[in-house]
């Protein structure tokens, strides 16, 4: 997470009109579950703005940026590349190895999450092709499960710096307060 070697998420591909919500949720999930930044394709500007707005309101640290060359990001990444795909090795068989590379060896991780059909060169360039259940499902779900396994649940306890507001956990109802007032609302 934020004290460790970097974890970045690359959204590979974005179909305007079709992928707006999913691309945004890739970014929001990356932020909420411990990644340091997300890189969106350059045609995903609305997703970028939404993720930046949420980070401004609910805290960070987290960066969101656009890239005009996502394949170059993979090729030039200085660290390990994990491609999340339903065709990869089972997450439960490789998560410890990936965690060791990240935690013990200090390797930065780039998590690649596809949209449309992913070209074969991504499979070849990845250090790991990882499948969460090896069944068709949402790339957001795959990213969430992978990040939780990578951080072993530590991401669920993170503090949010520079937040304008804070959600107060409740059994029933919804409560959002100014961040400065959050401590007096926690039991």
Describe each region flagged by the PLM.
Residues 10, 63-67, 130:
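General small-molecule cofactor/ligand-binding pocket signal
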Residues 38, 81, 129-131:
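Short, well-ordered beta-strand core segments
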Residues 48-121:
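S-adenosyl-L-methionine/SAH cofactor-binding core of RNA-modifying enzymes
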């Amino acid at each position: 997470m934020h004290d460790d070697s970097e974890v970045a998420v690359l959204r590979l591909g974005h179909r305007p009109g079709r992928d707006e919500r999913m691309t945004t949720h890739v970014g929001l999930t990356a932020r909420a579950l411990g990644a340091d930044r997300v890189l969106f394709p350059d045609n995903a500007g609305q997703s970028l703005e939404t993720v930046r707005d949420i980070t401004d309101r609910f805290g960070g640290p987290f960066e969101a940026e656009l890239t005009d060359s996502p394949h170059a990001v993979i090729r030039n990444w200085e660290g390990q590349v994990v491609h999340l795909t339903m065709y990869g090795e089972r997450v439960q068989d490789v998560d410890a190895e990936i965690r060791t590379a990240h935690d013990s060896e200090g390797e930065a991780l780039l998590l690649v999450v596809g949209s449309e059909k992913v070209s074969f060169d991504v499979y070849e360039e990845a250090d790991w092709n990882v499948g969460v259940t090896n069944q068709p499902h949402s790339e957001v779900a795959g990213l969430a499960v992978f990040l939780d396994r990578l951080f072993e649940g530590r991401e669920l306890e993170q503090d949010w710096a520079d937040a304008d507001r804070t959600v107060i956990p409740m059994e029933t109802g919804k409560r959002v307060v100014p961040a400065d007032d959050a401590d007096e609302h926690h039991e």
